[in-house]
């Protein structure tokens, strides 16, 4: 089964979105 570009993109989004929110939250809390 070949890996699609779409699947890679979705996997990246799924990994990056929570990380982005965690980073934003961390900056808000450290004020």
Curated annotation (Swiss-Prot):
Compartment(s) of residence: Plastid, Chloroplast thylakoid membrane
Keywords per UniProt: Chloroplast, Membrane, Photosynthesis, Photosystem I, Plastid, Thylakoid, Transmembrane, Transmembrane helix
Pfam families reported for this sequence: PsaM
InterPro entries named among the record's database cross-references: PSI_PsaM (IPR010010), PSI_PsaM_sf (IPR037279)
One BP term from GO: photosynthesis
Signal peptide (UniProt feature, chain positions): none
Membrane topology: Single-pass membrane protein
This protein's GO CC annotations: chloroplast thylakoid membrane; photosystem I
Transmembrane segments: 7-26
Keyword Transmembrane helix recorded: yes
Main location: plastid
NCBIfam families assigned to the protein according to its UniProt record, in alphabetical order: PS_I_psaM
Family classification: Belongs to the PsaM family.
Protein name stated in the entry: Photosystem I reaction center subunit XII
Phylogenetic lineage: Eukaryota, Discoba, Euglenozoa, Euglenida, Spirocuta
């Amino acid at each position: 089964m070949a890996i699609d570009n779409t699947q890679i993109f979705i996997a990246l989004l799924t990994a990056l979105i929570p990380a982005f929110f965690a980073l934003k939250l961390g900056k808000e809390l450290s004020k």
